[in-house]
Amino acid sequence: MQPIVDPAESEEMDPQAEEVADNPTPSRDDPFSGLKVMVIDDSKTIRRTAETLLKKEGCEVVTATDGFEALAKIADEKPDIIFVDIMMPRLDGYQTCALIKNNQVFKRTPVVMLSSKDGLFDRARGRIVGSDQYLTKPFTKDELLGAIREHVHT
């Protein structure tokens, strides 16, 4: 009979194994694993928050600070869903959404508008340019993931 070794007395864990334990890879059963999500917002805080939440769920995250930067990245990265702030410099969220929805390649890509405003006019304007949903900032993890579940068939 082999003695049971107390893990505390065993050799130290391999550094690579420690890294994997600290940063687990999402399982294949994870509905968000490998999903490509784009977050367009001029607020570094919003971009980082969304990126952190989404990466923990297994998503691949692409970020942009405004619509101009986003358009090139959308063409290159082909995201599964796009979150876009309505108020940004150079090319705002409404204009960005309209350009995405008028493009034959990306018109079926879900676009979720992000705003600190919760007015009926802002929501209606988002719908007019083709957005699929409207989230008010600050959003919760559940709201962010719920939007993905609703619009992307995982």
Predicted regions and their residues:
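C-terminal output helix
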Residues: F139-I148
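Active-site beta3 strand of CheY-like receiver
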Residues: E77-F83
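Short hydrophobic/Thr-rich beta-strand motif most characteristic of the beta2 strand and flanking loop
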Residues: G58-T65, K73
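Receiver (REC) domain active-site loop signature in two-component systems and cognate sites
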Residues: M88
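C-terminal catalytic ATP-binding subdomain
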Residues: M1-P26
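Charged docking surfaces used in two-component/phosphorelay signaling
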Residues: R48-K56, A124
